[in-house]
UniProtKB/Swiss-Prot annotation:
Protein name, per record: Protein arginine N-methyltransferase 5
Organism of derivation: Homo sapiens (Human)
Cellular compartment(s): Cytoplasm; Nucleus; Chromosome; Golgi apparatus
EC number: 2.1.1.320
GO biological process: chromatin remodeling; circadian regulation of gene expression; DNA-templated transcription termination; endothelial cell activation; Golgi ribbon formation; liver regeneration; negative regulation of cell differentiation; negative regulation of gene expression via chromosomal CpG island methylation
Residues covered by region (Beta barrel): 465-637
The keyword Transcription appears for this protein: yes
């Protein structure tokens, strides 16, 4: 009946629903709504004014059907086109016991009937501070049924009483809630989802009013599992031609919600009576088509958003051909390497020596040869002579290198099939070039590899890269917390999945504070006793009430002088997609109050066979130390 169903957001068009409080003729209404261009209908499952009695006689045994027949629509239509709504009189957290008990029974009746119909989603209101019993009834329903419905909690972006203009300024108000103003509704949601133990089936339907809160409040909401945004017709303005439009601030919010692929629900009567109701939907389509186009990084990362991957271990494992292929497609990385090698060659070889001074350049971890090609291009660009060694431990990639040498490179390049730490070089290098960095800089063991290879670098030799630094930032993300929680493996400790890092394209998250530098490594390392173990303490000021779920890791590297690569958001190399950030989760979410400081301790540890990280939060409260002795995750040497 409709082109798209609930849960079908994606692609270029907007997925949208129409919210109605009363639907006398369901099939006719659904047809009319579909004709207007909407994909689904939000409607009460029972008549909103039909208060059932479950406790007292005689009303308890009132004869006749409780609601309309499921035969009015096909099973497929119930499954895809209808979102159920709870009757407005149901108040399971009422202080009046009779109302509470009756509401519990009515709520279960409506949820069970929704499950019987196979509804894809059910809308429930969160409109007060105490929703504890609502959470209990819903959790019990989720755990007892065999249905798969989603539950969308309808939460206002700004609490209704915050918009009252009848309150005299500075006069005391009667409400006694702990949180006021912009914080309030997020705290309702946060407490509710905590009571429901972060159930993946409970999401947010965010109701957007005419007044918007400050940016940090909006940022925080965008780290939540928002499945729908409810737009009342009353928030639309009118343009010169009489069509509904939104303010610039609202448009910016819609653009950000579109990135999260939320579905939009239009509620309320037509406030632009001379225009068709579908003009509200047409305006959303217009916004969708006119949003900023995705950049190269976003295009590359499409489909990988919030998808957890285990970090590569190229030292312990031999990479596959396709893995090399993906990294070789990066347009920025190799041009930066070429620029760094070019500058280095010009600095090391003066113009008058360009025909006699042959620089020995060693590519350590040559893979399938992209750095060898970048080096050859740099030498040609600089008009300097080089002699190249391509050192690679993966015997499969060596086949590719030998083919390159036979077909293209010739005697200028010597291919060496060996681990760089064990290779006995025939001569010392002027320049060593490597691409051994992971998302957290040193997590693919670049320090250990380059330290093991620097004995064949001349005393005045140069390493490209010369330095790299890892960065950490605290983040909040229900989505990522649930993704990590779902990674539990049968024969391992039940919390082992929280003691390992993940490479992930961060998407549905809120960064709580700016990234700070963690560990720095420099090459060549001239310390008499080389020790790559590290320990750091980082303190992050937090300016908003929130919840901590883990830490995002990034890195920056100086290839040579002013030539750099970075995945830190503030300095990210434009268009570079070789690395996604890394995520270090924590076992238990930690509530953080506005003005508090998050303190994290981070260790880099090692023994003769492996390297691992350990981490712990020590403020505002203490967590357990994660991954002690590398019990859940190590990187093999």
């Amino acid at each position: 009946m409709a082109a798209m169903a609930v849960g079908g957001a994606g692609g270029s068009r907007v997925s949208s629903g129409r919210d109605l409080n009363c639907v006398p003729e369901i099939a006719d209404t659904l047809g009319a709504v579909a004709k207007q261009g909407f994909d689904f209908l939000c409607m009460p499952v029972f008549h909103p004014r039909f208060k059932r009695e479950f406790i007292q006689e005689p009303a308890k045994n009132r004869p006749g059907p409780q609601t309309r027949s499921d035969l009015l629509l096909s099973g497929r239509d119930w499954n895809t086109l209808i979102v159920g709504k709870l009757s407005p009189w149901i108040r399971p957290d009422s202080k009046v016991e009779k109302i509470r008990r009756n509401s519990e029974a009515a709520m279960l009746q409506e949820l069970n009937f929704g499950a019987y119909l196979g509804l894809p989603a059910f809308l429930l209101p969160l409109n007060q501070e105490d929703n504890t019993n609502l959470a209990r009834v819903l959790t019990n329903h989720i755990h007892t049924g065999h249905h798969s419905s989603m539950f969308w909690m309808r939460v206002p972006l700004v609490a209704p009483e915050d918009l009252r203009d009848d309150i005299i300024e500075n006069a005391p108000t009667t409400h006694t809630e702990e949180y006021s103003g912009e914080e309030k509704t997020w705290m309702w949601w946060h407490n509710f989802r905590t009571l429901c133990d972060y159930s993946k089936r409970i999401a947010v339907a965010l109701e957007i009013g005419a007044d918007l809160p400050s940016n940090h409040v909006i940022d925080r909401w965008l780290g939540e599992p928002i499945k729908a945004a409810i737009l009342p017709t009353s928030i639309f303005l009118t343009n010169k031609k009489g069509f509904p439009v939104l303010s610039k601030m609202h448009q910016r919010l819609i653009f950000r919600l579109l990135k999260l692929e939320v579905q939009f629900i239009i509620t309320g009567t037509n406030h632009h009576s001379e225009k068709e109701f579908c003009s509200y939907l047409q305006y959303l389509e217009y916004l969708s088509q006119n949003r900023p186009p995705p950049n190269a990084y976003e295009l590359f990362a499409k489909g990988y958003e919030d998808y957890l991957q285990s970090p590569l271990q190229p030292l312990m494992d031999n990479l596959e051909s396709q893995t090399y292929e993906v990294f070789e497609k990066d347009p920025i990385k190799y041009s930066q390497y070429q620029q760094a090698i070019y500058k280095c060659l010009l600095d090391r070889v003066p113009e008058e020596e360009k025909d006699t001074n042959v620089q020995v350049l060693m590519v350590l971890g040559a893979g399938r040869g992209p750095l060898v090609n970048a080096s050859l291009r740099a030498a040609k660009q600089a008009d300097r002579r080089i002699k190249l060694y391509a050192v690679e431990k993966n015997p499969n990639a060596v086949v590719t290198l030998e083919n390159w040498q036979f077909e293209e490179w010739g005697s200028q390049v010597t291919v060496v099939s060996s681990d760089m730490r064990e290779w006995v070089a025939p001569e010392k290098a002027d320049i060593i070039v490597s691409e051994l960095l992971g998302s957290f800089a040193d997590n693919e063991l670049s320090p250990e590899c380059l330290d093991g290879a620097q004995h064949f670098l001349k005393d005045d030799g140069v390493s490209i890269p010369g330095e790299y630094t890892s960065f950490l930032a605290p983040i909040s993300s229900s989505k990522l917390y649930n993704e990590v929680r779902a990674c539990r493996e049968k024969d391992r400790d039940p919390e082992a999945q929280f003691e390992m890092p993940y490479v992930v394209r961060l998407h549905n998250f809120h960064q709580l504070s700016a990234p700070q530098p963690c560990f720095t490594f420099s090459h060549p390392n001239r310390d008499p006793m080389i020790d790559n173990n590290r320990y750091c303490t980082l303190e992050f000021p937090v300016e908003v009430n929130t919840v901590l779920h883990g830490f995002a890791g990034y890195f920056e590297t100086v290839l040579y002088q002013d030539i750099t690569l970075s995945i830190r958001p503030e300095t990210h190399s434009p268009g570079m997609f070789s690395w996604f950030p890394i995520l270090f989760p924590i076992k238990q979410p930690i509530t953080v109050r506005e003005g508090q400081t998050i303190c994290v301790r981070f260790w880099r540890c090692s023994n003769s066979k492996k390297v691992w990280y350990e981490w712990a939060v020590t403020a505002p409260v203490c967590s357990a130390i994660h991954n002690p002795t590398g019990r859940s995750y190590t990187i093999g040497l």
